[in-house]
Every structure is written in C-alpha cells, then in structure tokens.
C-alpha cells in the first residue's frame, strides 16, 4: 500500500514541484491551496506526512499545525514546513511544534528527499 502525503501550498509552482518529488518517491499525493482545505484533507485521508508552506492565504502554517496537533486523529502526523525564512525568526515560529521540521526555499530536490525519508523512518 502506498504511503500518503499531503502538500499544502498556495504557490502552484511549489505545489507541483513538491507533488512531483513525492510521487517519484512512491507517495499517493493529496493537494490543498490553503490551510482550511488542508486540515479537512488531513482529517479525512490521515496522510503519513504533511508538507506545508509556512505562509498560507488563510492562516499561518504554524496555526494550522496547532489545529492538527489538537486532533487525536492527526496529532502524530509529521509536518515538514517549506519556508523562505530559514533564519532564526522562521525557525522560531515552528520550533515548538512537535514532530516537525523545515525545508528552505528554493527547494533542493536532494535535501527534500532526505528530509522526507527521515520523517517517514521516524514515524514508522
């Protein structure tokens, strides 16, 4: 059975790249262009990993993650944030969210694959 991934990103180019990289890695990929839709999909599909932009049109990625962490069905899903803010302020926003990490933009395909692999191994 394929592992499931959810990509939440409002930038169509980033969404497509992340989706393609995950599909090549063998994931069934679900997509959302905002946090509210992403939260709904996460609750329904229970993906093995969530890739989420830090800045979404309807709420911050950290806020969406906190909502997911409060739900017993989604609280343990690893979340990898994608952000252009790899400086201290960007890390600060997500550092207290359990079972999460980040990938900087622009996305390096090798780093992306390595980070996803690390989170899937930890979750297994």
How should these model regions be labeled?
Residues 13, 33-37, 60-66:
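Acidic catalytic/metal-coordinating carboxylates
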Residues 15, 57, 75, 87:
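The feature encodes the CheY-like receiver
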């Amino acid at each position: 059975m394929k592992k499931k991934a959810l990509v939440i990103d409002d930038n169509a180019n980033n969404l497509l790249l992340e989706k393609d990289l995950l599909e090549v890695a063998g994931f069934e990929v679900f997509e959302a262009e905002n946090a509210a839709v992403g939260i709904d999909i996460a609750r329904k599909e229970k993906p093995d990993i969530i890739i989420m932009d830090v800045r979404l049109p309807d709420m911050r990625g950290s806020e969406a993650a906190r909502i997911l962490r409060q739900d017993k069905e989604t609280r343990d899903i690893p979340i990898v944030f994608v952000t252009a803010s790899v400086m201290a302020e960007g890390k600060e926003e997500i550092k207290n969210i359990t079972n999460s990490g980040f990938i900087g933009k622009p996305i390096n395909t090798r780093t992306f694959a390595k980070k996803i692999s690390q989170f899937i191994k930890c979750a297994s």
